[in-house]
């Protein structure tokens, strides 16, 4: 079977398993060449299979600390109808490379929102793994089941200050389109907060603390985004922004309790605009990111996920310097993105963008390549003309 990238309504339907393997290896290779850092030895990542979560796992394992890791993610393998999800293979191949290095890489393919999953992870920590030094919450999910009430909540990417129409990029057709987004209802805002806010992160921390699974002075981090005013209406001032504000509010509560009980700390890291499975489908964001990529690459300050996370650990969290937070207690890894010279140039290009010239004025080529890489396509060193053995792939277990 030969696997090619097939688009369905702007999504890439299939994945290339060995392209995913190459992408994991590329990130590992970057970490091996980076300056490195001394950091946590035992790490739990919820949302570990792609984007910032995967980069976090790779960084702590191969970027210096040689950490043992637990990853929680909800993914599917090969079936008669589909070859599986990218995260499924990212988990498999991360584990392969970690084991070669003598590291524990335990995967839980479970619903992170469920109490049963939390119980399984905690039991493993207490029985086999040992107390964790770092807990990273990097979950991006479309739905959440509240196992206490049985209610199922669905997140929506909507505005809250009236309807919105803005340009976005259709990577299937390589063109700019206008995307209309309606204003959210009170119920939709609350459901999005339930799914993408800090409630589940807080529940994880409460359970881990109650069961004595944190080491002394342990750290927990959740990832967020603020971005440019160009994306405010759909992001920071939209349903997602309300959820992220909740995440930041929960960080303060978690931090107070961890600090009091174990001398630990909790905070949100505000990261830069990058192509991830979550961000690629936010209206306006793809065009903004493509322009930003061009500007930051020209200034030699562009970072992809693994570069950003490696810098976060080596220069901010586990450096010899005291961590600098903003006035709301957040770590600002979007510092380079929001530099005045960067944003001024982004604004200049944005004002001149048209459907005819956007490929020339932005780094659309680089943006699309990263988008394709998410599912294992368009990577150097992968033979995409080679038949894949589906039966062999079915035998692979994360």
Curated annotation (Swiss-Prot):
NAD(+) binds at residues 47-52, 74-75, 111-112, 139-140, 244, 274-276. GO terms for biological process: fatty acid biosynthetic process. The record marks 75 as: Plays an important role in discriminating NADH against NADPH. One of its GO terms (molecular function) is enoyl-[acyl-carrier-protein] reductase (NADH) activity. It is an enzyme of class 1 (oxidoreductase). Substrate binds at residue 225. Its EC number is 1.3.1.44. The active site is at residue 235. Pathway: Lipid metabolism; fatty acid biosynthesis. InterPro entries: Eno_Rdtase_FAD-bd_dom, Enoyl-CoA_Rdtase_cat_dom, FabV-like_NADH_b, NAD(P)-bd_dom_sf, Trans-2-enoyl-CoA_reductase. It catalyses: a 2,3-saturated acyl-CoA + NAD(+) = a (2E)-enoyl-CoA + NADH + H(+). Keywords: Fatty acid biosynthesis, Fatty acid metabolism, Lipid biosynthesis, Lipid metabolism, NAD, Oxidoreductase. Used in the biosynthesis of medium-chain volatile alcohols as biofuels engineered by microorganisms. The switch from the native flavin-dependent enoyl-CoA reductase used in the production of n-butanol, a key second-generation biofuel, to a flavin-independent trans-enoyl-CoA reductase from C.acetobutylicum leads to an order of magnitude increase in product yield in engineered E.coli. Involved in the fatty acid synthesis (FAS II). Catalyzes the reduction of the carbon-carbon double bond of crotonyl-CoA to yield butyryl-CoA. NCBIfam families: EnoyACPredFabV, PRK13656.1. Possesses high activity for the reduction reaction, but no activity for the reverse oxidation reaction. Belongs to the TER reductase family. Monomer. This is Trans-2-enoyl-CoA reductase [NADH]. It comes from Clostridium acetobutylicum (strain ATCC 824 / DSM 792 / JCM 1419 / IAM 19013 / LMG 5710 / NBRC 13948 / NRRL B-527 / VKM B-1787 / 2291 / W).
């Amino acid at each position: 079977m030969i696997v090619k990238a097939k688009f369905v309504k702007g999504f890439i339907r299939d994945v290339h398993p060995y392209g995913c393997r190459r992408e994991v290896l590329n990130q590992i290779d970057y970490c091996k060449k980076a300056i490195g850092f001394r950091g946590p030895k035992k790490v739990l990542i919820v949302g570990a299979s792609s984007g910032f979560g995967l980069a976090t796992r790779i960084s702590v394992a191969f970027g210096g600390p040689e950490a043992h890791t637990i990853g929680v993610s909800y993914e599917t393998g090969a079936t008669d109808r589909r070859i599986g999800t990218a995260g499924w293979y990212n988990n498999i191949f991360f584990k392969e490379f970690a084991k070669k290095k003598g590291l524990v890489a335990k995967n839980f393919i479970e619903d992170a929102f469920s109490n049963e999953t939390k119980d399984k992870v905690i039991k493993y920590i207490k029985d086999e793994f040992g107390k964790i030094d770092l807990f990273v919450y990097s979950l991006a999910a479309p739905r959440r089941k509240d196992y206490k009430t049985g209610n199922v909540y669905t997140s929506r990417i909507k505005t809250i200050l009236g309807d919105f129409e803005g340009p976005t990029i259709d990577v299937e057709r390589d063109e700019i389109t206008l995307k209309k987004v309606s204003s959210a209802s009170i119920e939709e805002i609350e459901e999005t907060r339930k799914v993408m806010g800090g409630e589940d992160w807080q529940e994880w921390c409460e359970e881990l603390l109650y069961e004595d699974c944190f080491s002394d002075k342990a750290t927990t981090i959740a990832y967020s985004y603020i971005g440019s005013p160009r994306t405010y209406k759909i992001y920071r001032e939209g349903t997602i922004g309300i959820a992220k504000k909740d995440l930041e509010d929960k960080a303060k509560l978690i931090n107070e309790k961890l600090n009091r009980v174990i001398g630990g700390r909790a905070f949100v890291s505000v990261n830069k605009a990058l192509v991830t499975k979550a961000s690629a489908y936010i209206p306006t964001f793809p065009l903004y990111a493509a322009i930003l990529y061009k500007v930051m690459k020209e200034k030699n300050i562009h970072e992809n996920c693994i570069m950003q996370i490696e810098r976060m650990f080596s220069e901010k969290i586990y450096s010899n310097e005291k961590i600098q937070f903003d006035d709301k207690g957040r770590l600002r890894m979007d510092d380079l993105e929001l530099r005045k010279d960067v944003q001024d140039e982004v604004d200049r290009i944005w004002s001149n963008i048209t459907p005819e010239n956007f490929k020339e004025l932005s780094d659309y080529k680089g943006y699309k390549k990263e988008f394709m890489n998410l599912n294992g396509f368009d990577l150097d060193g992968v033979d995409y003309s080679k038949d894949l053995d589906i039966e062999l792939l079915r035998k692979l277990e994360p």
